[in-house]
A protein has these predicted regions:
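Beta1/beta-strand and adjacent pyrophosphate-binding region of the FAD-binding site
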Residues: 3-18
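Glycine-rich FAD pyrophosphate-binding loop
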Residues: 27-47
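Predominantly flavin-linked oxidoreductase catalytic cores and closely associated redox partners
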Residues: 124-266
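Short beta-strand to alpha-helix junction loop
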Residues: 100-123, 245-250
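C-terminal helical "tail/cap" subdomain of flavin- and related membrane-associated enzymes
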Residues: 330-418
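N-terminal FAD cofactor-binding segment of flavoenzymes
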Residues: 45-89
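FAD/FMN-dependent oxidoreductases across multiple families
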Residues: 243-328, 333-337
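Conserved hydrophobic helix-helix packing surfaces used for dimerization/oligomerization
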Residues: 10-12, 33, 297
Length: 418
């Protein structure tokens, strides 16, 4: 069989949010690239389906018309105005994402099935600068001199694609990471999650608040209930792999047990129906700084282990890291420098400058979650104090305020009502 030769500036492995985010901005910068995707869109992706304000920010920067399209499609995208924390003792706390809500203000976040979101993003990628191969199987990734070469099979044809740079946007089982980085996850930096779609869950917020239930048996993980369009809800659990292994937890049994027996949750599922199967996936958490690039390669999204350790949200950071990768690539192309040293400065350092504080705080909060008494204490105090609720709300947009959660002085102030 004849091997077809292709060359480009950048190869992107994976067409999910991280790959799409990279592609959008490479197109903006006029940089040719080839996207290689193993599946065919639309395709499902197991996920919590919640999108933070970071998702909206990147999409808006890519093209404001795309965000307007999302905000105007209530059948596919459900605006979310806040979050409900349920403490281990069952007490709940509603926290809006913003205190400055008006009729003209778009919701800071939204929920959407990943099949819908990823297909939306995928269909925005085609451009004169972007060539896409779907249903393509990569058999080899190698560095050849100052370039990278990817060998793939597509529609019974074999291709060798050569480029100056390769982007690993291929998820937590990334081939690019495995080949070039040596970056790997451990049970302490990896979580496992289950996702189920239910129809007919009652008691959902009229403002579509997402819910995090910190059940004692799941700490430092939680059970979530996220409202979706058309009366659906994404219901799931996420727990550190280390905890699952040590306690020999059966996630599926634990989730279903909570749905059937928990006094706050069970009545809401009395007439709910499971739609499809309960499915699992892995979450590589950003618990510590890692090397995100090297000679001729950059890792983005889950391949770069950039999932928020506290919230478990990865879509926003996937898109955001893709945008930052494209910015770094623009500089690399201008300087004709694709070395690890240059990319570390142009990409790694920028990622951690933009996201580092947020991720460090989230990692600390994730560790604090195992203290039931502390969680119960903060929720109890916040239920009685409007000013404390407002402070917690402001933490969603103010990283310095959020940092207070790591400090003992914050809890002393709550204790003495200061």
């Amino acid at each position: 069989m004849t091997v077809q030769q292709l060359s480009t500036t950048v190869i992107i492995i994976g067409a999910g949010p991280a790959g799409a985010g990279t592609s959008f901005f490479l197109t903006k910068y006029g940089i040719p690239h080839i996207v290689i995707e193993k599946e065919t869109f639309p395709r499902d992706k197991v996920c919590g389906d919640a999108c933070s304000g970071k998702t909206a920010l990147v999409i808006n920067r890519a093209n404001p018309e795309w965000l307007a399209e999302i905000l105007g499609d209530a059948q596919s995208f459900l605006p979310s105005w806040g979050i409900t924390f349920v403490a281990p003792d069952g007490k709940s706390l509603d926290i809006p994402f913003t205190l400055a809500r008006t009729q003209e203000t778009p919701a800071p976040g939204f929920t959407v099935p990943r099949m819908v979101l990823d297909d939306f993003l995928f269909n925005k990628m085609p451009s004169p600068y972007c060539t896409i191969f779907q249903n393509a199987t990569v058999s080899e990734i190698a560095r050849v001199g100052d370039s990278v070469k990817v060998t793939m099979t597509h529609e019974r044809a074999i291709y060798e694609v050569t480029a100056s740079l390769i982007i690993g946007a291929d998820g937590d089982k990334s081939m690019v990471r495995k080949q070039f980085s040596g970056l790997d996850t451990t049970p302490k930096t990896y979580a496992v999650g289950l996702r189920a779609y239910y129809e007919g869950v009652t008691g959902l917020s009229k403002d579509n608040f997402i819910e995090l239930h910190f059940l004692p048996e799941m700490l430092p993980g939680y059970l979530w209930i996220f409202p979706l369009p058309n009366g659906m809800a994404n219901v799931g659990v996420g727990i550190l792999s280390e905890v699952v292994r040590k306690k020999k937890i059966n996630l599926r049994e634990q989730m279903l047990h909570a749905i059937k027996t928990n006094p706050q949750i069970a009545p809401r599922f009395a007439n709910a129906k499971l739609n499809g199967k309960i499915q699992g996936w892995g979450l590589p958490l950003a618990m510590e700084r890692q090397n995100l690039s090297g000679d001729n390669f950059i890792l983005t999204g889950d391949a770069a282990c950039l999932i928020d350790p506290f919230s478990g949200e990865g879509i926003g950071n996937a898109l955001y890291s893709g945008m930052l990768a494209a910015m770094a690539i623009q500089h690399a192309v201008e300087q004709n420098d694709f070395s690890g040293a240059f990319l570390k400065s142009a990409y790694d350092d920028v990622v951690y400058k933009r996201l580092g504080d947020e991720l460090r705080i989230s990692a600390a909060l994730q560790k604090l979650c195992k203290y039931q008494w502390l969680f119960n204490f903060v929720v109890k105090k916040a239920r009685k104090s409007a000013s404390l609720r407002n402070t917690i709300s402001a933490m969603f947009s103010n990283i310095d305020l959020r940092d207070q959660l790591r400090r003992p002085s914050f809890y002393l102030k709550i204790l003495f009502n200061r």
